[in-house]
């Protein structure tokens, strides 16, 4: 089975080697996948902790200053907890922020409903009305192509892994 998160990090690593403007911002998650990126690119990595509203606002500001931020966290944390910042700061300004949501449905059911999306397309239903936001829902085999395509564009994007 192909792992979408691992493919995402590998592809982002390839891009970060060539582009020092890439910065990966995580919300205190993903350590089994992002540790190598963090070690290889310490100046292009920020663990913002559980500050979803703040890290989305930071990403918007960084994008408007010429950086290429990728915000990575569990789906509810990058779509619901910071919806206002995503809407107002990222989408309305068409900021070049790539939002990476991981683990749909009830993958984290042992952590309660705050860590899950039910129904499975809840995130897409919430985001589909936002201006300038391109939504990608790739299969694991499509992740590399989607990351490369979204990198080449300057609009905000949501990639659901």
Kindly label every feature range from the protein language model.
Residues 1-161:
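Thiamine diphosphate
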């Amino acid at each position: 089975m192909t792992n979408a998160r691992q493919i995402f990090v590998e592809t982002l690593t390839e891009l970060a080697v060539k582009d020092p403007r890439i910065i990966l911002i995580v919300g205190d998650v993903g350590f089994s996948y992002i540790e190598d990126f963090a070690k290889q690119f310490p100046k292009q990595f920020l663990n913002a902790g559980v500050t979803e509203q703040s890290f989305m606002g930071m990403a918007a500001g960084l994008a408007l200053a010429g950086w290429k931020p990728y915000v990575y966290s569990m789906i509810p944390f990058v779509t619901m907890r910071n919806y206002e910042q995503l809407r107002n700061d990222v989408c309305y300004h068409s900021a070049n922020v790539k939002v990476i949501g991981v683990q749909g449905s009830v993958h984290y059911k042992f952590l309660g409903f705050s860590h899950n999306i039910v129904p499975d397309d809840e995130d897409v239903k919430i985001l589909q009305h936002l201006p300038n936001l391109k939504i990608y829902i790739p299969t694991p085999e499509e992740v590399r192509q989607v990351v490369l395509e979204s990198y080449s564009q300057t609009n905000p994007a949501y990639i659901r892994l």
